[in-house]
Amino acid sequence: MPTSGLSAEVRALVDWSAIDTVLLDMDGTLLDLNFDNHFWQTHLPQRYAEARGLPPGSGREELMARYHARAGTLAWYSVDFWESELELDIMRLKEEVAHLIDIHPHVVKFLEAMRAAGKRVVLATNAHHKSVTLKMAKTGLTPHFDAIVSSHALDAAKEEQAFWQRLRAIEPFDPARTLLVDDSLPVLDSARRYGIAHLVTIRKPDTQKPVKDTGDYPAIDDFSQLMPWRMKGS
């Protein structure tokens, strides 16, 4: 039985006969995190400084402190919050660098394989619905999902137990028969506490940055490693 495309740790974890539901993160998991990192760490600070007549580069330190204060909360992920907080048109600024939005390798084939295998595929993201709309428009991934759920619709970030409780209320799933793929260790920790049995992370969410710490979670370099051999295309 061919298994060369799968790492031993992923082969050991993902028994596809034991999985009914696949929950997928968006930014850093299906999509290259380079867009988000560039936007929040470079582009927005630049535009923020320009809007306030500050010297180039001087706005970054202030924004980094503001980001840090909101990390892991719904506010951090909210376009509306940052538009109010910074008095800037965040979505217009995102459009300026939207050419950086890109799908990670083998994602589309993986999504097609999941549908062919009869798995229920749900995009479960902390991204604000405005960001989701932009990225789905740029990537065309929407038809591959049975449902798209933003944490903002549930009023709880994925780092919180309330997110999983509320998700299950609208999207029934058996935690013991569910796979979550996410690049965020705090989110994976939260899902583990909730009881989601199958957890996989991403080694390189941002293609322009080094491999990240994946903790004790099985990790993939790309989605070709996660596809069961019998589902692989050419």
Which residues fall in each region the model found?
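Catalytic-core regions built around general acid/base machinery
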Residues: 106-118
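Asp-based, Mg2+/Mn2+-dependent phosphohydrolase catalytic module
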Residues: 1-20, 112, 128-234
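Short active-site oxyanion
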Residues: 118-122, 175-178
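Ser/Thr-centric signal marking residues that sit
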Residues: 29, 125, 178
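Short, flexible loop segments at the rims of nucleotide/cofactor-binding pockets, characterized by
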Residues: 97-102, 126, 155-158
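Short glycine/serine/threonine/alanine-rich loop segments
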Residues: 54, 88, 119, 173, ...
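N-terminal helical cap/lid subdomain that shapes the substrate entry/recognition surface
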Residues: 6-109, 130
